[in-house]
């Protein structure tokens, strides 16, 4: 399948204008947080959505969808490969206050990583949690580490050992709220919702019997 980067870039710029960098929910009333991640076997992708109790950090439920992915991985355009899988799940699953997405939100060359793409197109509050930096420079912001791009703080950095997590706005959440929620949910290498989604998707992908 041919991938048109120019048209994809234009769509990203248009959608980036629709991102809301403010809380569309009450941060004090959060009860359940979902995590989204994708694993692959060949050209088949498995998207998993894991719901975690925000107070106890215990897993509540896990959901998944399996489908062939016709679009190849293109740096900066991950959403066009993985977002359709995520959106299929989001339409089916209820009972969460926001979603953590494995990938970037606003920390993207055109301001629309997969977390923002998924958030804007679904209307669901999302947070980007990425393991690698796409844009910006790391600086000190008081007692925190932050990522600054074009003169603006676009992410906070959370460290767990040698692992860095870049926490950014996806959609319908403020950066401060995104940081506080991810920090609370991260007791090991990854925030619990994404860690569970990663485990589930990897396990299912390994078990697939492909022709």
Swiss-Prot record:
Keywords: Cytoplasm, DNA damage, DNA repair, Endonuclease, Hydrolase, Magnesium, Metal-binding, Nuclease. Its cofactor is Mg(2+). CDD domains: Endonuclease_V. GO terms for biological process: DNA repair. The keyword DNA damage applies. One of its GO terms (molecular function) is RNA endonuclease activity, producing 5'-phosphomonoesters. Its EC number is 3.1.21.7. Pfam families: Endonuclease_5 (PF04493). It is an enzyme of class 3 (hydrolase). This is Endonuclease V. The gene is nfi.
